[in-house]
Amino acid sequence: MRRTYGGQLWVASLAAASALTLLAARASAFCRSSTCQADSTCDYDEHGCPVGGHPTVWHRSCITFSVQEDGSPRMHITAEKAGQILEQAYGSWTNASCEDGTPSIQAFRLDPVSCNRPQVNLCDRNASIWIFHDDVWPYEDDDLTLALTWTHFDPGTGEILDTDVEVNTAQHVITTDPKGMGAQFVAIATHEIGHIFGLAHSPYLYATMFENYRLTNDMSELSNDDIQGICTLYPPDRKTGPCVPEPLNGFASDCGTERCDPEGCCSTAPGGNSGSKGGAMLLTGLGLLVGWRRRSGRRRSNLL
């Protein structure tokens, strides 16, 4: 299915390495991601939640994901194994118990893909990809980051169009063995999927969406705070169209075009954006940290 958007379309990739400040817990602490995080124009409330812009959310009733076909040889994680764990992690969110049912969004796994970088093609086919970086983590000053989610959206509405996740297996030991040493991939995945659905970091210490990885509890088990967040974003009675389980403009295994055509359609990826009419803007990413980092001038989230 091919979709078009009127006016100027920008895409942002939201790197949530927000300040590592421990805020007081409250009964309901979930925060929503916003378009204002793309250009750092947000204000922040007393709980650290972004204020301003449009909240980011999927308008459709189902989304898809794929694993990059190489998986992580260094961590002995095959694409198939990762896909199985991701199905479990997505299910934690989509099967959450809301007051009147379950969230009005589903997730479907598609075939592994050859594309090994995050991007969105506005005029071509796409894939929402989980990518493992075994050799080099491609971002500077990010040795604490376990994973990073890139959210591509329409800044005029906040509608999420595409997401990609990068996992830092170059600098961290990440395991799929529940008794193994290292960070649990299922916990990392569950946190990043919260970003995929439009949640920002929560100040609630025991939430899956807390920005730091914890060894003291299982982050793959949603807290009441996380459940309230997903049920608020996707209430069971939300009006949506029929489920079409394919990415924006259809599914592609390769990375597709990287240049704008004469009409202004293009792809966008971390590290660049297009100012052309109908082009795309990269928002930056949200992630999970393995440790504490002092507040810096930029907003980004690291999962520990």
Predicted features, each with a name:
Residues 3-7, 191, 304:
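N-terminal low-hydrophobic presequence detector
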Residues 25-279:
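Zinc-dependent metalloendopeptidases
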Residues 298-304:
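Cytoplasmic C-terminal tails of single-pass
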Residues 278-295:
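A cross-kingdom C-terminal cell-surface attachment/processing module
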Residues 12-21, 284-287:
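Bacterial N-terminal signal peptides
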Residues 18-27, 292:
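C-terminal segment of classical bacterial N-terminal signal peptides
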Residues 2-14, 275-279:
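Bacterial N-terminal signal peptides that target proteins for export
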